[in-house]
């Protein structure tokens, strides 16, 4: 998933959380974001491992440093849809394309015209709308991406 001249690498998270995860979690908590802490708790409890059909969890490394993480799970409320989850990009790595590359890579793995939802934090609404999600505040999410129009 890496271009030869691109210092940003995306790697699937399969068996263990990535090296550097504790620093990522500390940054998220310092900003008041709990999604990375929830990811760690769910991972340890084995309740969410991003291993069902259509699911994935990707880590983003820039020059070897864990810059961000993001996943896609089955949407529990909207039939047939998937949900972007546990997205976080460290402050030092924002606005340089890390989040966009995570989203693009996850969407590339989606089969068919499945809709994708996200429950966007207020600070991330502009980002999610910039990658094609539209406001749709219902069923526990804030935005939806209709793959039919992509």
Outline where the language-model segments fall.
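Short amphipathic alpha-helix that is part of the acyltransferase structural core
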Residues: 1-45
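A short helix-loop-beta-strand connector motif used in the catalytic cores of GNAT acetyltransferases and
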Residues: 47-59, 83
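Conserved beta-strand in the GNAT
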Residues: 59, 65-74, 83, 88
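Active-site beta-strand termini and strand-to-loop segments that position acidic
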Residues: 61-63, 147-148
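A short acidic/small-residue loop/turn micro-motif
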Residues: 74-76, 143
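Conserved acetyl-CoA pyrophosphate-binding loop and the N-cap/start of the following alpha-helix
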Residues: 92-105
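Conserved GNAT acetyl-CoA-binding A-motif
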Residues: 110-121
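Conserved acetyl-CoA-binding loop of GNAT-fold acetyltransferases
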Residues: 129-139
């Amino acid at each position: 998933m890496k271009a030869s001249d691109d210092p940003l690498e995306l790697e699937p998270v399969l068996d263990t959380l990535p090296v550097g995860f504790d620093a990522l979690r500390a940054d998220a908590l310092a900003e008041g974001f709990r999604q990375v802490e929830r990811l760690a708790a769910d991972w340890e409890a084995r309740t969410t491992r991003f291993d069902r059909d259509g699911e994935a969890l990707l880590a983003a490394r820039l020059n070897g440093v864990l810059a961000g993480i993001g996943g896609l799970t089955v949407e529990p409320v909207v039939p047939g849809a998937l949900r972007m989850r546990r997205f976080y990009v460290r402050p030092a790595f924002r606005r340089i394309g890390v989040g966009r590359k995570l989203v693009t890579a996850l969407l590339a793995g989606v089969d068919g015209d499945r809709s994708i939802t996200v429950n966007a934090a207020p600070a991330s609404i502009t980002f999610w709308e910039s990658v094609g999600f539209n406001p749709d505040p219902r069923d526990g999410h804030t935005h939806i991406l209709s793959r039919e129009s992509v």
